[in-house]
């Protein structure tokens, strides 16, 4: 079965989200490592993790699309960003649960 461009874009976004959320325990370990003193410059662990998760998802997603040789249009990027950022509260809840922030 050949997926449509829209199906590929949606499927790859879901894949990127899943992959990055699975990396949250590692991100927490790095962030909380006293060697780096990040807790002195980052005021909110939760917002730090949210920013890290969103940036990692976008990076991973971009790689998935490049591998499929798809360059999203401006409208598709708008949809991608809206879809991702509209889930910020959901991601925060997952971050709280996974890394106990």
List each model region and its residues:
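Charged, amphipathic alpha-helical oligomerization/scaffolding segments
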Residues: 15, 19, 52, 83-86
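Short terminal alpha-helical segments
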Residues: 1-34
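Extended alpha-helical scaffold/tether regions of large eukaryotic proteins
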Residues: 4-10, 39-42, 81
């Amino acid at each position: 079965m050949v997926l449509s461009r829209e199906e590929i874009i949606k499927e790859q976004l879901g894949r990127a989200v899943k992959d990055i959320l699975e990396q949250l325990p590692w991100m927490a370990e790095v962030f909380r490592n006293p060697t780096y003193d990040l807790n002195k410059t980052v005021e909110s662990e939760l917002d730090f993790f949210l920013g890290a998760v969103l940036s990692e998802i976008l990076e991973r997603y971009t790689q998935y699309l490049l591998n499929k040789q798809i360059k999203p249009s401006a409208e598709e990027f708008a949809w991608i960003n809206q879809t991702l950022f509209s889930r910020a509260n959901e991601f925060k809840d997952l971050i709280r649960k996974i890394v106990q922030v």
